[in-house]
Regions:
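Short alpha-helix boundary/capping motifs
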Residues: 38, 72, 98-102, 119, ...
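Asp-based, Mg2+/Mn2+-dependent phosphohydrolase catalytic module
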Residues: 1-2, 15, 110, 114-117, ...
């Protein structure tokens, strides 16, 4: 069975997020605190990466992540702490609602999914993303029909790379007797977690990043269409 991470593996989280953040910048008058939407985007993504790393380790809750990823950039921009906290609640709702309606996929994603489906491969999603937005992404971009099941950390009770997440995915799919293989862009959450769980793993590495020292037992592709030569 083939398991795909969703964000930045199949669904273009980076590109879609930039559009949503620009919409927030313009609709909420953020030029009062940031010189450009580029500055706002850079500050947000720096903070968001730090918080997602903490969330993946279980150091913070999803509720804290969702509020702090907007409150902290606003404070950095000069918004008072109280106002930043209030604005962050609204920003989170607006952002996730907009994000769930975006449709851009990673280059070659649909072509590759069509090919794998035509070859009879069963495919599922494994994601740390929030339930209320991940299903909207799948439906809006018309890729929900490729995947069964969709396994989210909200349902598993733990995040990738925890072993219990991967065991839960296998239980949901009933794929204990199958070879489970993950394709994902995150070396620690997707690849290291899968290898530890005894899965096969293919690192989607479009940027050509250097691998982590000491991590073995996985393959690498820089374009999703390479999967057509492997399956």
């Amino acid at each position: 069975m083939l398991w795909f991470d969703l964000d930045d593996t199949i669904w273009d989280m980076s590109g879609n997020s930039v559009i949503c953040l620009r919409e927030l910048y313009e609709s909420q008058g953020l030029d009062r605190w940031f010189d450009s939407h580029v500055e706002w985007d850079e500050v947000y993504h720096r903070v968001n990466r730090e918080l997602w790393a903490q969330y993946g380790r279980g150091d913070i809750t999803r509720e804290f992540l969702r509020s702090e990823r907007f409150a902290r950039p606003l404070r950095i921009g000069g918004v008072s702490e109280g106002d930043a906290e209030k604005m962050a609640v609204d920003f989170d709702t607006l952002y996730l609602d907009s994000l769930g309606r975006k449709t851009a996929l990673i280059a070659g994603a649909r072509e590759t999914l069509d090919y794998l489906q035509s070859r009879g491969y069963r495919m599922g999603i494994v994601s740390n993303g929030f339930r209320e937005v991940q299903y909207n992404k799948l439906r809006s971009s018309a890729i929900d029909g490729y995947f069964d099941p969709v396994v989210l950390s909200d349902d598993a009770g733990v995040n990738k790379p925890h072993r219990r997440f991967f065991d839960y995915a296998v239980e949901r799919a009933g794929s204990q007797a199958m070879r489970n293989i993950i394709i994902g862009d995150n070396l620690s959450a997707d690849i290291a977690g899968a290898v530890d769980a005894g899965w096969g793993a293919i690192w989607f590495n479009p940027g050509g990043d250097a691998p982590c020292d000491g991590l073995t037992g996985y393959e690498c592709v820089v374009d999703l269409r390479e999967l057509k030569r492997r399956f």
